[in-house]
Design a protein with these regions (language model features):
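Glycine-rich nucleophile elbow surrounding the catalytic serine of serine-hydrolase chemistry
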Residues: 14-24
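Short alpha-helix in the alpha/beta-hydrolase fold that links the catalytic acid
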Residues: 127, 141-148
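Short beta-strand/loop motif that positions the catalytic acidic residue
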Residues: 125, 131-133
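Conserved alpha/beta-hydrolase catalytic His-Asp/Glu region
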Residues: 47-49, 66-121
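Acidic catalytic loop of the alpha/beta-hydrolase fold
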Residues: 136-140
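Catalytic active-site module of serine/aspartate enzymes centered on a nucleophile-bearing elbow/loop
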Residues: 155-189
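Conserved acidic catalytic loop of the alpha/beta-hydrolase fold
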Residues: 1-9
Length: 189
């Protein structure tokens, strides 16, 4: 950002390792972080999510990408959306298709996710922060997102009780966008 001449940015980490990376940016560059938004995140992986990530990698290695894609897609989307969109979600251009034929990349992603640990450093985040908790998220469940909110001074939390890991459906996406845009507007200026 320095090379681009950008002084402050909104760090919007939506689902997964991107949200974790933005925790690191907010910690190491408080001058750069105007705000931070985290969804589908964690401060430190617990045993269950570690086993889940390792299982996905093992399935990818042993059974192939298609089996991995089916497994993670069923866990990532709510049942109605999955049933209505299965043909789009699974296949060559479906969910997580960037990992097709990329077991090495999947391995690095898993290692990065498992080594992420900001729990004792979140207290140093100064940027206004919004952490969203999705009640039906079976991947990064609220047991993982709550410690992020609780350990960042002044962080705001927002619960989407009926949202899965990936927020889908018109009403849920509108709700998500309204919460996100209202938070960013409140802290712009």
């Amino acid at each position: 950002m320095d090379l681009l001449g950008i002084d402050e940015v909104h760090l919007v980490g939506i689902i997964g390792i991107g949200a974790c990376i933005f925790q690191e940016v907010a910690i190491s560059r408080p001058d750069l972080a105007k705000t931070m938004v985290n969804t589908g995140t964690w401060a430190c992986p617990d045993r269950k999510v570690a086993d889940q990530l390792n299982l996905w990698l093992e399935v990818h290695k042993v059974m192939g990408f298609e089996a991995f894609q089916k497994m993670v897609t069923m866990e990532g989307f709510n049942p109605e959306f999955y049933a209505q969109n299965k043909e789009k979600l699974i296949g060559p251009n479906g969910a997580w298709s960037d990992l097709r034929d990329n077991v090495a990349t999947h391995q690095r992603l898993t290692e990065a996710a498992l080594s992420h640990n900001t729990l004792d450093r979140l207290v140093s985040i100064q940027a206004p922060t919004l952490v969203m908790h999705n009640g039906l998220d079976f991947i990064t469940a609220p047991r993982l997102t709550m410690p992020v909110e609780q350990n960042i001074p002044g962080a705001e939390g927002y619960w989407m009780r009926n949202a899965a890991h990936v927020v889908t459906g018109r009403e849920a996406r509108i709700e998500f966008c309204n919460v996100l845009l209202n938070f960013l507007e409140k802290h712009s200026g």
